[in-house]
Amino acid sequence: MSTENDYIVADIGLADFGRKEITIAETEMPGLMACRAEFGETKPLKGARITGSLHMTIQTAVLIETLVALGAEVRWASCNIFSTQDHAAAAIAASGVPVYAIKGESLEDYWIYTDKIFQWADGGFSNMILDDGGDATMYILLGARAEAGEDVLSDPHSEEEEILFAQIKKRLKASPGWFTKQRDAIKGVTEETTTGVNRLYQLSQKGLLPFPAINVNDSVTKSKFDNKYGCKESLVDGIRRATDVMMAGKVAVVCGYGDVGKGSAASLSGAGARVKVTEVDPICALQAAMDGYEVVLLEDVVSSADIFISTTGNKDVIRIDHMRAMKDMAIVGNIGHFDNEIQVAALRNLKWTNVKPQVDLIEFAKGNRIILLSEGRLLNLGNATGHPSFVMSASFTNQTLAQIELFTKPGQYQNQVYVLPKHLDEKVARLHLGKLGVKLTELSGEQAAYIGVTPQGPFKSDHYRY
């Protein structure tokens, strides 16, 4: 572990390796490079102090260096204990950006690192949060509520909550009043993923959101690309790296058919698996059926399928009774944000055999075993390297534009959750067309008038479903 200066990474000696991969990734991330070209001189993020909690990968390194190029000061940690790419973290730390991220870090370290990305050397405060899953935002808001006298730390419902609450109490004791001051310094948060967005909307509905938020996840150029096409490539990559299993002919069950589920089903189907889908939403279920997938109850296929993937963003999707009934050596994994989609805690009293990092064999009393990937956390990042650079460029360009929007327009946004305007969504798409050799047809003035748009766009209404 390398801990000198203002960073904690696995091995700072990996920085050169990380830098080489960052250089390659930059050629696949035209949106972020275009942001540097457009905003690099004016530096609209000058004065921004961004706390970032997002998977510390090579692609994220390109995002971080884009934010810095636009004038921001940045402190960073990963939003998942298994998703860090240690050479990426080393390269960013070596560049002078404080990073706290190690692949396979403990939950205790995870929350310590989340605290550290708010601790500036001069004692100042972060004024922006760039979040993935909402943990950094939740950390500050829970602490501030505790300082206000609310009883929010006395009843943890999981091991992770117990560890989180202990870290908040530690900071409360060390720095009384700090959480409230940090909360009040935040100008806005930009949130990357469905799970974190749901948290923000819940806060907003209860009147508990103390600063504006931009829902990056629901930008079309994020959810319809990162969630779908990213998962389409990275899910099978993770399963193969973890197990070396042949997927052709296997029966795979995808729990959920939202954008992530659609990409996951396509990923497995493309590898030759026979895919079945479970759903609670009648619209998504109908989509799955008309896409050619059998829509089933998990209970009806749990003893016959070979691979189970949860994609829902909900909890207790694959339960202990499901796993107990699975065939010997069934593969169980999750590509939703948190590990509680699978009841991993209920497996802890069984026999675990670690096969290799993030691959565990778990044996039930009757002798059947399951292969659990990444302890139920994101397997595409835990067992592989996540989505490809190109699709992450679209997501991270949205993040960059959202950070600029909130930081440069104080007072224009209320304490609510917003999405980026359509013209910026279309801008993100345009920035990625050239890399693929795409040529856009242009509307004539008469054609544009006929459908009620301008020749330059936006071309669709805000409620259009792509």
Curated annotation (Swiss-Prot):
Note accompanying the cofactor annotation: Binds 1 NAD(+) per subunit.
Keyword NAD belongs to the record: yes
SUPFAM superfamilies referenced in this protein's UniProt entry, alphabetically: Formate/glycerate dehydrogenase catalytic domain-like, NAD(P)-binding Rossmann-fold domains
SMART domains cross-referenced by the UniProt entry: AdoHcyase, AdoHcyase_NAD
Subcellular location: Cytoplasm
Reactions this protein catalyses: S-adenosyl-L-homocysteine + H2O = L-homocysteine + adenosine
Positions annotated to bind NAD(+): 193-195, 227, 256-261, 279, 314, 335-337, 380
Enzyme class of the recorded protein, top EC level: hydrolase
Gene Ontology terms describing biological process: L-homocysteine biosynthetic process; one-carbon metabolic process; S-adenosylmethionine cycle
Keywords: Cytoplasm, Hydrolase, NAD, One-carbon metabolism
Entry superkingdom: Bacteria
Binding-site residues, substrate: T57, D132, E192, K222, D226
Primary localisation category: cytoplasm
Cofactor: NAD(+)
Pfam families reported in the protein's UniProt record: AdoHcyase, AdoHcyase_NAD
GO cellular component, one term: cytosol
The family this protein is said to belong to: Belongs to the adenosylhomocysteinase family.
Function: May play a key role in the regulation of the intracellular concentration of adenosylhomocysteine.
Protein name: Adenosylhomocysteinase
Source organism per UniProt: Rhizobium rhizogenes (strain K84 / ATCC BAA-868)
